[in-house]
Amino acid sequence: MASQFQAYFKLTKFRLTSTVAFSSGMGYILAERGQVDWLNLVLFLIGGFSITVSANIINQIIERESDKLMKRTASRPLPEGIITVQQAIITSALFLIAGTVILAVYSTLNALILSLISLVIYSFIYTPLKTVSPIAVFIGAFPGAFPPMIGWIAVTGEYGWEPGVLFAIQFLWQFPHFWAIAWVLDEEYKKAGIKLLPTKDGRSKHTATIIMTYTLCLLPLGFLPYLFGMSGITSAYIALACGILFFFQTMYLWKECSVKAALLLMFGSFLYLPIVQIAFVLDKIY
């Protein structure tokens, strides 16, 4: 029973799903003009979390055969046969229904629609495209950048420049983030036929130059929340400082072209986004 529970827990990709929920929560708090309705926020996060779990399970169903080929993913519940495809489909459907109902009641229609669009793009377009072309990273960056936008729209019910700003920052951040991961796991990905690095040169200065360019473009975006009155100037400078450090890591990758440098960049990307988003929120509140 315990091992079965652990398998289902693993199926949810809890850490990944939690980061998605976190960024949507940041968007939600930034959109609130008065006192945050914490109960509604928690319920919104549960709804979004559930839909994200559903998408992650669909992803694992589709990739169950290729997951067997990689050491990092071979121990997932589906490749190991601990959970059957039928059980995974039922679990995904239950999470999807639960998330849809919760968001329908405690969110807005536009936030619900965008959440479902995100699931479709991630599960049925990005996932199979990973073995076809590196353009999968571009496609996957859309659902990857929707969470803070969904959080904002869950409060306001409307699209606009402000949620677009949150989307733009997270959208551009994903390129160095995913390419750093793809660099580290390049040999594993090749076994499974996954193509995510932006050039055919693989781990090369050409690839590192592209990663540097995208990271450089991210630097000025940190000032947009301040310019649109979403947050203060302090957080803009924090975002700039984090962006510069992030860029220095890409320079190190260009110089070394090593897995070690890519690992540092990967961990740097993990830190960049939550630090910047927390800075925006705290600067708005205080």
UniProtKB/Swiss-Prot annotation:
The record's subcellular location field reads: Cell inner membrane
Per its UniProt record, what Pfam families does this chain match? UbiA
Supply the EC number(s).
2.5.1.141
Protein topology in the membrane: Multi-pass membrane protein
What's in the GO CC field? plasma membrane
Catalytic activity field: heme b + (2E,6E)-farnesyl diphosphate + H2O = Fe(II)-heme o + diphosphate
Q: What keywords would UniProt list here?
A: Cell inner membrane, Cell membrane, Heme biosynthesis, Membrane, Transferase, Transmembrane, Transmembrane helix
Top EC class per UniProt?
Answer: transferase
The terms under GO molecular function for this entry are: protoheme IX farnesyltransferase activity
A GO biological process of this protein is: heme O biosynthetic process
* Keyword Transferase carried by entry: yes
Q: Quick check: keyword Transmembrane helix in the entry?
A: yes
Gene3D superfamilies xrefs? UbiA prenyltransferase (1.10.357.140)
- What residue intervals traverse the membrane? 14-31, 38-58, 94-114, 135-155, 165-185, 207-227, 228-248, 262-282
The UniProt entry's coiled-coil ranges are none
The biological pathway it contributes to is: Porphyrin-containing compound metabolism; heme O biosynthesis; heme O from protoheme: step 1/1
Q: Which family does it belong to?
A: Belongs to the UbiA prenyltransferase family. Protoheme IX farnesyltransferase subfamily.
> What is the additional note?
Carbon 2 of the heme B porphyrin ring is defined according to the Fischer nomenclature.
Q: What's this chain's function? A: Converts heme B (protoheme IX) to heme O by substitution of the vinyl group on carbon 2 of heme B porphyrin ring with a hydroxyethyl farnesyl side group.
What's the protein here called?
Answer: Protoheme IX farnesyltransferase
Give the species.
Cytophaga hutchinsonii (strain ATCC 33406 / DSM 1761 / CIP 103989 / NBRC 15051 / NCIMB 9469 / D465)
